[in-house]
Design a protein with these regions (language model features):
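A conserved structural/catalytic subdomain of Rossmann-like adenosyl-cofactor enzymes
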Residues: 2-14, 20, 303, 307-531
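Non-catalytic, mostly N-terminal accessory regions of nucleic-acid modification and defense proteins
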Residues: 1-224, 228-229, 291-300, 402-406, ...
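Conserved, well-folded catalytic cores of nucleic-acid-processing
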Residues: 35, 176, 180, 199, ...
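A generic secondary-structure signal for well-formed alpha-helical elements
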Residues: 56-69, 204, 233, 257, ...
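Short small-residue beta-strand/loop micro-motif enriched in glycine and branched aliphatics
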Residues: 205-208, 262-263, 439-440
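Conserved S-adenosyl-L-methionine
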Residues: 211-317, 322-324, 328-333, 338-343, ...
Length: 531
């Protein structure tokens, strides 16, 4: 027993130490990012910090790859010290394995070393980024590397009004990113570059308001969605997010399952070019090989890119809330096999359930989809009610979870999670009221680990808990006119103070009796005095 306690304490201490070091890393990174931007808006400046961090990562990743192999034969080998001509011999094999090639002179460490004396640093960097992308031309990795540096404009006025000012700012960025002691943190088991990148994106998103919320889902929500989608699955063929943003939801599956248990990889589609690039960079930074991620640019509803793929075992998404779409203005969509089963298209002013139907059509028979939804889709009438009726009658709705308000960047609305399955064991739907499962941190609410665990265990156990969750069958949902709002099925706890009217009445009667007795005593005393 003592041994187990000792091991548990050691594990807790390691976790605490890792958390402290992670916080230290985060504080350092954000301080550097803020100092670098100066008067430039943080949202506009993010491309430079994130882009140069990525450049450092791929440089070190590639150099370490060669050093690790060559030092088995020659302990003094250093890829960064080779001439470009000497390194050319490994170009082909490097592209096959890593997806791109960086000659020694173009590595981050060497560019950083020469930066203070390079009066054309912006030109140097632009040429390097162009050559990195060109190295993948004609290779299987081409689509995953092409345009990765497109948003990193080293000649932008955001860096300075003159050539010299821009070079000075770029030098400072290189020195700041290069000065981060990221290697020290790797000893703590922290996925340093990936962790730093996700932290920076979260901070930029939180400071950007609505625009930030469009590309980044908070980590704690991403983790909950992934674990719900993975219930009863120890491995999956692949995972899909049709509105993948920066890719944080997809990457949760690597963290929860391990990359080897996502056999065919990570699939996503993103409509915004900048966010699409952020997502691909995020994949590389989390050491996902180019052959295992398939992120494409385009409109998911009108131009789906993964329709020929085999169905997905896991689908997770946080689609844009009540965004407009073409809807029935395009009559061809009514014949689209994604939407036609419901017999109606989602309304033009709110595409939420169009995304839901799209995901359902891509889901495998043994798979699970976990989707963040705007609450209006649960109760609005018209076409959305007809789609809900279809989903209920076909027994696709496994669970509806009401989330706390103010969880997401850019909106304070209380959203919900809709869980879809094609292989339900019975016709019941679980409704969970998790609206109070949060801890307030600053201006936002957070789903802490205990909150996430409570929601997940409730989903897994599927047992009714008064005032927290309830099961409803098809008939009951039909009686509620296919309204899927959680408060229709989970009775709210009455927290008002209950006043016992009988108790004060009893006290009043007792006071009256005492008052009467005192009067009688007083009358007796007065009579005695008169005698």
């Amino acid at each position: 027993m003592e041994n187990k306690n000792t091991q548990a304490n050691e594990k807790n201490n390691e976790h605490a130490s890792s958390s402290l070091e992670r916080n230290e890393l985060h504080n350092t990174i954000w301080k550097v990012a803020n100092e670098l931007r100066g008067s430039v808006d943080g949202w506009d400046f993010k491309q430079y910090v994130l882009g140069i961090l990525f450049y450092r990562y791929i440089s070190e990743n590639m150099a370490n790859h060669h050093n690790e192999y060559e030092r088995k034969l020659d302990p003094s080998f250093d890829y960064a010290s080779l001439s470009d001509e000497e390194a050319e011999i490994v170009r082909k094999s490097t592209i096959e394995e890593k997806g791109f090639f960086i000659p020694p002179s173009a590595l981050f460490c060497n560019v950083l070393k020469n930066a203070p004396h390079n009066e054309d640093l912006n030109v140097t960097l632009q040429n390097i980024f162009t050559e990195i992308e060109k190295s993948s031309l004609g290779a299987p990795s081409e689509e995953n590397v092409k345009g990765l540096f497109a948003d990193l404009d080293v000649n932008s006025n955001k860096l300075g009004s003159s050539h010299q000012n821009r070079v000075e700012k770029l030098t400072k960025i290189l020195q700041a990113i290069g000065g981060m002691q990221l290697g020290d943190y790797q000893q703590s088991g922290i996925d340093v570059f990936g962790d730093a990148y996700e932290y920076l994106m979260a901070m930029y998103a939180s400071n950007a308001g609505k625009s930030g919320g469009e590309f980044f889902t908070p980590q704690e929500v991403s983790e909950l969605l992934a674990k719900i989608a993975l219930h009863n699955q120890e491995s999956i063929n692949k995972v899909y997010d049709p509105c993948c943003g920066s890719g944080s939801l997809l990457l949760q599956f690597s963290k929860v399952l391990g990359d080897k248990n996502v056999s065919k990889g990570y699939f996503g589609q993103e409509i915004n070019l900048t966010t699409y690039n952020l997502c691909r960079i995020n994949m590389f930074l989390h050491d996902i090989n180019y052959s295992k991620f398939h992120i494409v640019l385009g409109d998911t509803l009108l131009d789906p890119k993964h329709e020929d793929d085999e169905p997905f075992d896991a689908i997770v998404s946080n689609p844009p809330y009540s965004t407009k779409w073409v809807g029935d203005n395009n009559p061809l969509l009514m014949n689209d096999e994604r939407f036609s089963p419901a017999g109606v298209l989602a309304p033009k002013k709110a595409a939420d359930l169009a995304f839901t139907m799209h995901m359902l059509s891509y889901l495998s028979n043994q798979g699970t989809a976990a989707i963040v939804e705007f609450p209006g889709v649960l109760y609005r009438d018209g076409a959305e009610k007809k789609i809900r009726e279809y989903l209920v009658k076909e027994n696709f709705i496994d669970c509806v979870i009401a989330l706390p308000e103010n969880l997401f960047f850019g909106t304070s609305i209380a959203t919900c999670i809709l869980v879809l399955k094609k292989n339900k064991k019975d016709d019941t739907t679980l409704f969970i009221d998790a609206s109070k499962e949060f801890v307030k941190e600053g201006k936002k609410n957070k789903l802490k680990e205990r909150n996430r665990e409570k929601i997940l265990q409730t989903y897994i156990e599927r047992k009714e808990v008064k005032h927290f969750c309830a099961l409803a069958n098809m008939e009951e949902i039909k009686e509620n006119d296919y309204n899927l709002s959680v408060n229709r099925y989970v009775e709210q706890e009455d927290t008002k103070e209950i006043i016992d009217i009988k108790a004060p009445n009893g006290e009043i009667a007792q006071i009256v009796r005492k008052q009467s007795a005192l009067r009688n005593s007083l009358d007796f005393i007065i009579k005695e005095l008169e005698i």
